[in-house]
Amino acid sequence: MTATIYTTADLQRFIDAHVIQAELLRDIGHTPTVPAAALALGVTPDQIVKTLLFLIEPPGQDAATPVVVISHGERCVDKGRLAVRFAVSKKRVTLAPAAVVLATLGYPAGGVPPFGHHTPLPVIVDASVQALGARHGGVIFAGGGDDCTMMRLTVAWSPLA
């Protein structure tokens, strides 16, 4: 299967089509990690969020279920909590390899944005991201479609009920 590879131009079209208040910051340097992104942007690492793809392997199924997790950049995602959420053992929760990330989401690992993916998937937003809304005026940065582009967003968290 050949992966559909999205570009920053594809992400900008998604942002425009969905009227998302986000700004792509292009050509800021090589930013595949949270520390590199923070350094390139001149911000603290606690302003960076990361978008990760996990594979959940339910017993008795031939294929793993991909799940997107958006987390505070300085935190490790607790695979044990994901396992509980999906009623599987912790060993059945793995971080997707780079080739699977590209084939599933359309963006390379290290530059995955929080939205606009090739394949619509369940998304889990870690509670740590909500807490970012109270700091730095709510301004956060996320992957911008490649490892030289970041996206500037503002966290606005409002319960629906």
Region locations from a protein language model:
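Extended, low-hydrophobicity, polar/charged segments
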Residues: M1-A161
